[in-house]
């Protein structure tokens, strides 16, 4: 590991505040809210579109506005947490996220909802890095880190699936607006808990923000994320899409160049030059590419092909959620203290890929219990074995003043991976479906059945791609994540644990 692993040895576990586990509950609650919100609105989107008069062309901005702001501003949010103080940034993010959620729930026009979703994404970009940073600096003993990151990784991995469940229940039994309003009471509880339990880090009030780095880095990320968001509806060769990718690459290249010269860089490059940490970032991005695309296909398959209601669709993901939590808290968290991280991450990716491969056999007549449930369980266990070690290993030994931006880099990998997965796998599915329908539609009377078969064919082809990408994630983890298992007791070079209030 590099210089970021240096620092004052961790204090003995006896010095840690016994209420730190209640602090973990607060952090986990906030993280669940952010991750859940990335998918909960998907279930509510058809109802919101009808209520607010959105067109098919602009409804995607309910999703795109959130992902653009979230993915584009994460590095800035992480550095703000380092400069201003983690607890203060965490509370500001919670309050802002709650206010934006209330605004979205009360939206009377499509534009008002789009603006609220963008604000949600902006405050999520402040909230998510500070949450992970607080976790990193609070739990430094290797055994405790395993338990804490097991819980955090379980929520980070299963939050999207939980979003489908909660979104389905709220949409069917209340209305779509409660998919946004639900964040308000969660945020209020988290703010009260944060003020009472979390330690106030001093921040660095005299430090300067790397403004050129912010403009270049955030601008590049926004262009890349927006490019992937537009790639599916417009096509990969559309001039706007190509221009966005080109601008994004140029800005990010300029960002890297500037970071080598900036007196106080937004993202110190030693963070991503570390082989193990870079491997964790890349593993996360690749794993999420497969996972996010799969969520989308399974949602459509259950609702369009199997004719599930929103509630039934959400509940169908419950075994996946339980499996992710089990893999993260009961397997990875117990083993990470004894085995190298890659010995969890690589088998986890293999397990998830096998689960995906089972889904490539889906047909219009497949059943949930026989054909879908076993695959979801395997995927969930595999993702649990990936997420927890990635979060724990990527943040291990990071200097406290860099914990926020390191946490932001992990979240950025996750967010950009999700954008790529949604765009890439959607394109594969759409192209494959169209080719199948063209080749097999010989009798107009069979149009409906052939179309359904074509849709499922497109899904299965895209799932093969997702499985291949998941295997690539496992290969990256096996080759790049070279960290050894942490020893029991204080970790050498770990940051000093912070106390809860």
Task: Report the location of each language-model feature.
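C-terminal module of multi-pass small-molecule transporters
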Residues: 84-94, 107-111, 115, 127-131, ...
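Transmembrane core module of solute transporters
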Residues: 19-69, 175, 212, 237-244, ...
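Transmembrane-helix bundle of Major Facilitator Superfamily
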Residues: 2-196, 330, 338-339, 345, ...
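Structural signature of transmembrane alpha-helices in multi-pass secondary transporters
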Residues: 34, 63-66, 70, 97, ...
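A membrane-interface helix-boundary motif in multi-pass transporters
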Residues: 172-184, 229-241, 309, 431-468
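C-terminal membrane-cytosol helix-exit motif in multi-pass small-molecule transporters
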Residues: 132, 184-203, 218-230, 247-262, ...
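Flexible interhelical linker loops that connect adjacent transmembrane helices
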Residues: 11-14, 191-218, 260-275, 336-337, ...
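Intrinsic disorder in cytosolic terminal tails and internal cytosolic loops
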Residues: 1-19, 203, 445-452, 480-501
């Amino acid at each position: 590991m590099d210089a970021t692993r240096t620092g004052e040895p961790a204090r003995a576990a006896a010095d840690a505040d016994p209420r730190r586990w209640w602090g973990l509950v607060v952090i986990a609650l906030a993280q669940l809210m952010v991750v859940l919100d990335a998918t909960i609105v998907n279930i509510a989107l058809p109802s919101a579109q009808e209520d607010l008069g959105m067109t098919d062309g602009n409804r995607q901005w309910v999703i795109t506005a959130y992902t653009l702001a979230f993915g584009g501003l994460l590095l800035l949010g992480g550095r703000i947490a380092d400069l201003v103080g983690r607890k203060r940034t965490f509370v500001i993010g919670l309050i802002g996220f709650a206010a934006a959620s209330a605004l979205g729930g009360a939206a009377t026009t499509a534009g008002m909802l789009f603006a609220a979703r963008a604000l949600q994404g902006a405050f999520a970009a402040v909230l998510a890095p500070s949450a992970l940073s607080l976790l990193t600096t609070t739990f430094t003993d290797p055994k405790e880190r395993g338990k804490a990151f097991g819980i955090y990784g379980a929520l980070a991995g299963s939050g999207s699936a939980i979003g489908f469940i909660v979104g389905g229940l709220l949409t069917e039994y209340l209305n779509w607006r409660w998919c946004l309003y639900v964040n308000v009471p969660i945020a209020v509880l988290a703010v009260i808990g944060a003020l009472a339990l979390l330690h106030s880090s001093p921040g660095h009030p005299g430090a300067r923000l790397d403004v050129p780095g912010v403009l270049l880095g955030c601008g590049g990320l926004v262009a890349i994320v927006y490019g992937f968001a537009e790639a599916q509806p417009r096509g990969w060769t559309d001039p706007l899409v190509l221009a966005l990718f080109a601008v994004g690459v140029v800005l990010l290249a300029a960002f890297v160049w500037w970071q080598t010269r900036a007196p106080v860089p937004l993202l110190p490059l030693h963070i991503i030059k570390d082989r193990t940490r870079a491997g964790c970032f890349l593993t996360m991005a690749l794993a999420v590419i497969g996972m996010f695309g799969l969520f989308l296909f399974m949602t459509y398959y259950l609702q369009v092909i199997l004719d599930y209601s929103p509630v039934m669709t959400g509940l169908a993901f419950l075994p996946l959620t339980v499996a992710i939590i089990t893999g993260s808290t009961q397997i990875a968290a117990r083993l990470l203290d004894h085995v190298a991280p890659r010995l969890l991450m690589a088998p986890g990716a293999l397990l998830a890929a096998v689960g995906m491969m089972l889904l490539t056999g889906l047909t219009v007549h497949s059943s949930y219990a026989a054909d879908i449930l076993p695959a979801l369980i395997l995927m969930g266990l595999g993702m649990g074995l990936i997420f927890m070690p990635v979060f724990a290993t990527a943040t291990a030994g990071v200097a406290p003043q860099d914990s926020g931006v390191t946490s932001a880099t992990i979240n950025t990998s996750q967010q950009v991976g999700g954008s790529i997965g949604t765009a890439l796998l959607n394109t594969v599915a759409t192209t494959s479906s169209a080719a199948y329908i063209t080749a097999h539609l010989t009798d107009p009377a069979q149009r409906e059945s052939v179309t359904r078969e074509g849709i499922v064919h497109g899904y299965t082809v895209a799932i093969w791609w997702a499985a291949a990408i998941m295997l690539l994630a496992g290969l990256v983890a096996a080759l790049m994540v070279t960290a050894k298992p942490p020893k029991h007791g204080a970790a050498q070079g770990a940051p000093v644990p912070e106390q809860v209030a």
